[in-house]
Design a protein with these regions (language model features):
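An intracellular "coupling" helix at the cytosolic face of ABC transporter transmembrane type-1 domains
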Residues: 4, 18-20, 52
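A conserved P-loop NTPase coupling/switch region
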Residues: 1-14, 66, 235
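ABC ATP-binding cassette signature C-motif
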Residues: 25, 31-253
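C-terminal boundary and immediately downstream tail of ABC-type ATPase nucleotide-binding domains
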Residues: 12-20, 246-253
């Protein structure tokens, strides 16, 4: 077993199940489990990607299998978000090949997507547009599954907290029961309870996950594979997160 997979199991074994008071029950987050697909879900061979025909990442040879939980490591500006966008179909390859399972559904979350929400609409209206055939009670139940209660669901997006916006984006990203979840800094606006709820939801999720985050607690409990994005390339990082963190500290001036 890879070192990070072993480290993750140890970290999970240390977690104690905490029973939350009823008033906090809405903090729970539930991701729907997709049907299993044959691996690989995604395969990239000799790929390069970037912006305006200028490559940011080159010589990409990557594979994502069903149930993989992958953390992208690397300094800011190395291309972690670029790789996330490529996997999420937000940008394309400049060279090489990218093949995906024909039935693959992808959910993508980025902290910058808050700009894509309609500020004068409520969370309920956002969901109603995405799921017009669902009954009012079904829509309320879906919102409740992401900790957005009846009162908050009727507030305009401009009036809800950053954490509630993040929950709404997570909900919209997972409506289609994605096989692959790509999450770029998902905990930035979440409070501690919501962060723990997200971790629990991701550890229970049966599909594949690709994570970009500075939250080492999240990464240590969710990821069992590490990819290092550095100097325009992406390669497996064979050590565990603790080794990576120690490596960063040693190299800091």
């Amino acid at each position: 077993k890879a070192k990070q997979a072993q480290s993750r199991l140890k970290a999970l074994s240390k977690l104690k199940t905490i029973s939350l008071p009823k008033e906090r029950a809405l903090k729970e987050i539930r991701f729907p489990d997709p049907e299993e697909l044959a691996s690989p879900l995604v395969a990239i061979e000799d790929g390069s990607t970037g912006y305006n025909k200028k490559a940011v990442l080159t010589k990409l040879n990557l594979r994502i299998d069903f149930s993989d939980k992958i953390a992208l490591l690397g300094k800011n500006g190395e291309g972690k978000s670029t790789l996330s966008k490529l996997l999420a179909d937000r940008i394309s390859l400049l060279n090489g090949s990218l093949t995906k399972s024909s039935k693959l559904r992808i959910g993508y979350f980025s902290q910058h997507q808050t700009d894509e929400l309609r500020k004068n609409e409520t969370p309920f209206e956002h969901l109603s547009r995405a799921r017009p055939n669902k009954s009012v009670s079904e829509r309320k139940k879906i919102l409740g599954g992401f900790g957005i209660g009846s009162d908050q669901s009727e507030l305009k997006v401009s009036a809800i907290s950053g954490g509630q916006k993040a929950r709404l984006l997570l909900l919209l990203a997972t409506l289609d029961n994605p096989h692959l979840l790509i999450l770029d800094e998902p905990t930035n606006h979440l409070d501690i309870e919501s962060r723990e709820a997200l971790i629990e939801a991701l550890t229970k999720f049966s599909g594949a996950v690709v994570l970009v985050s500075h939250d080492f607690h999240l990464l240590s409990l969710v990821s069992d594979k590490l990819w290092l994005v550095k100097n325009g390339s992406v390669r497996p990082y064979e050590e565990d997160l603790e080794s990576y963190r120690a490596d960063i500290l040693v190299k800091k001036p």
